[in-house]
């Protein structure tokens, strides 16, 4: 009997399965064999060159050429929209059962290619093996979970009342909008592209994906899975290229019926304000976070420090859910900082492809500069407890490596307000849970938050009063990070999200649909 495949999630704390590592090493070698190739856009079932090309180089070592990619144009986007509009009626008429069958086949292909795709992602954006493998697993599980939620809801087709008249037949049916644009980020290049594209297609829409240029290779892997699973021509289209042209055309073209964007608040809110022109159109934007953890005097400080460390420094802090600010009750502040610093200084930082690394590089020089500027401000205005340096020894000089950094600052400091997307966490002492919650809520964002307390009343107050969409209590695997499809819904409040509904949840697919009432009289 074959042993079940080990499931890797973001909450997986152990990485000592030797068979897993052997499989990953083989997949990584396969991924390395794909480096340096040229990849085209994909429109209406055909590969297409662009207006020149762009290169993607690994943040691990910029001597590594991940690939060369066709640079899409506004005209390419227009052709992709036209193809998607032509394909949409037949894709809808195919029926939801067949659509789900095709997309679930794509999930199986992603799982079967987990080691290779995880290796590609690790090289392309600098994830450690466990982070990369977890994300590939998440992408496949997103398809499976969204399919299950649709099936459990009879694909949103429900009879309504007839007020006692047997001749009247009424139904509520959810129908697709048409064509969706998906603009995905570099930091979760597979999960945050597969999630919205699969949900849109399940709903009967067709899709144009524009990935972050830094993660174009992962988008090619997604294309392979959809194409090999049998997604028809024109239903899924891929246009790579700059946000100023490809992204702008997707936002401005009236042939787009809905848009999904994951990225910065500035860009996301600009899309939200300007996307609807003649009439409202669905605009699903996830715009990051400045996520707080609260550590109270009753907390297990070992557990709290572990959770904060993992949430602050996993994928070098480049998660919208990363823990970047911590409010600690004053009596335990110094001890908590001591334990957190001790754990942080034990982390292995370096090339993420070998097994020992916990932190790899940040994505580019801009991220290095942002980290270094924050460190300079912390040195000027507070205390740098540990870290803060750029790492340039040997081969690290060819990548973008910085030390995980823990600082102490006044809670009014701008580094408690602004999202950094770097391995940097600020800690401040507070006098009460009331003060901690007030400070936590006094922020533009409202994505995730965590608390550590052994007092049930404190936990309940936190759950009732915190203004964020994803809450964690006493979580060693991550104070503010690690949501999983069907386990934790993931969506932001305030400046972190636009719809009030979350990804990874039972409500997600319905956001790609619109309600229609049918009344038929015999």
What role is predicted for each listed range?
Residues 1, 64-67, 92, 96-97, ...:
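Conserved C-terminal structural/oligomerization subdomain of aldehyde/semialdehyde dehydrogenase
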Residues 258, 266-411, 433-434, 438, ...:
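ALDH superfamily catalytic-core signature
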Residues 122, 152-303, 430, 499:
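Rossmann-like NAD(P) dinucleotide-binding subdomain of oxidoreductase/dehydrogenase enzymes
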Residues 45, 63, 84, 99, ...:
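Residue-level signal for inorganic ion chemistry
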Residues 57, 62-157:
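Glycine-rich loop-to-alpha-helix module at the N-terminal edge of alpha/beta enzyme cores
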Residues 88, 92, 107-114, 118, ...:
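Structural signal for hydrophobic packing residues in well-ordered secondary-structure cores
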Residues 1-66:
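Hydrophobic face of amphipathic alpha-helices that form TPR/SEL1-like repeat modules
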Residues 42, 60, 74-77, 96, ...:
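Residues at or immediately preceding the N-termini of alpha-helices
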């Amino acid at each position: 009997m074959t042993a079940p495949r080990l499931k890797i999630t973001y909450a997986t704390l152990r990485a000592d399965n030797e068979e897993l590592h052997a499989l990953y090493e083989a997949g990584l070698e396969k991924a390395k064999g794909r480096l340096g190739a040229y990849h085209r856009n994909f429109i209406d079932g055909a590969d297409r060159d662009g207006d020149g090309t762009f290169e993607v180089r690994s943040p691990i070592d910029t001597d590594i050429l991940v690939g060369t990619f066709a640079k899409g144009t506004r005209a390419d986007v227009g052709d992709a929209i036209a193809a998607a509009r032509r394909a949409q009626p037949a894709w809808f008429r195919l029926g939801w059962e067949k659509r789900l069958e095709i997309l679930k086949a794509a999930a199986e292909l992603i799982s079967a290619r987990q080691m290779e795709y995880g290796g590609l992602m690790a090289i392309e954006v600098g994830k450690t093996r466990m982070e990369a493998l977890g994300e590939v697993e998440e992408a496949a599980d997103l398809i499976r979970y969204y399919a299950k939620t649709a099936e459990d809801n009879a694909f949103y087709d429900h009879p309504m009342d007839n007020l006692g008249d047997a001749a009247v037949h009424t139904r509520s049916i959810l129908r697709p909008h048409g064509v969706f644009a998906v603009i995905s980020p570099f930091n979760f290049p597979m999960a945050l592209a597969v999630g919205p594209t699969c949900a849109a297609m399940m709903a009967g829409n067709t899709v144009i994906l524009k990935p972050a240029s830094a993660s174009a290779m992962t988008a090619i892997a997604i294309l392979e899975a959809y194409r090999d699973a049998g997604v028809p021509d024109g239903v899924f289209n891929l246009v790579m290229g700059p946000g100023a042209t490809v992204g702008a055309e997707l936002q401005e073209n009236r042939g787009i019926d809905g848009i999904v964007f994951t990225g910065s608040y500035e860009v996301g809110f600009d899309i939200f304000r300007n996307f609807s022109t003649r009439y409202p159109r669905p605009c699903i934007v996830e715009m990051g976070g400045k996520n707080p953890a609260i550590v109270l005097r009753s907390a297990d400080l070992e557990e709290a420090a572990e959770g904060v460390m993992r949430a602050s420094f996993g994928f070098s802090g480049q998660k919208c859910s990363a823990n970047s600010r911590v409010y600690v009750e004053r009596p335990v502040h110094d001890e908590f900082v001591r334990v957190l610093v001790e754990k942080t200084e034990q982390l292995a930082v370096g090339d993420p492809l070998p097994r020992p690394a916990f932190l790899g590089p940040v994505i580019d020089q801009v991220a290095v500069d942002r980290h270094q500027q924050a460190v300079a401000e912390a040195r000027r205005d507070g205390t740098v407890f540990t870290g803060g340096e750029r790492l340039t020894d040997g081969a690290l000089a060819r990548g973008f490596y910085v030390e995980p950094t823990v600082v102490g600052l006044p809670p009014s400091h701008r580094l408690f307000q602004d999202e950094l997307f770097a391995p940097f966490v600020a800690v401040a002492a507070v006098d009460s849970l009331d003060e901690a919650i007030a400070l936590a809520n006094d922020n533009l964002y409202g994505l995730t938050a965590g608390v550590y307390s052994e007092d049930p009343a404190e936990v309940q107050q936190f759950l009732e009063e915190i203004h964020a969409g994803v809450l964690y209590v006493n979580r060693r695997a991550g104070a503010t990070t690690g949501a999983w499809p069907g386990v934790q819904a993931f969506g932001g409040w305030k400046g972190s999200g636009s719809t009030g509904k979350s990804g990874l949840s039972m409500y997600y697919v319905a956001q790609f649909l619109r309600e229609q009432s049918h009344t038929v009289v015999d």
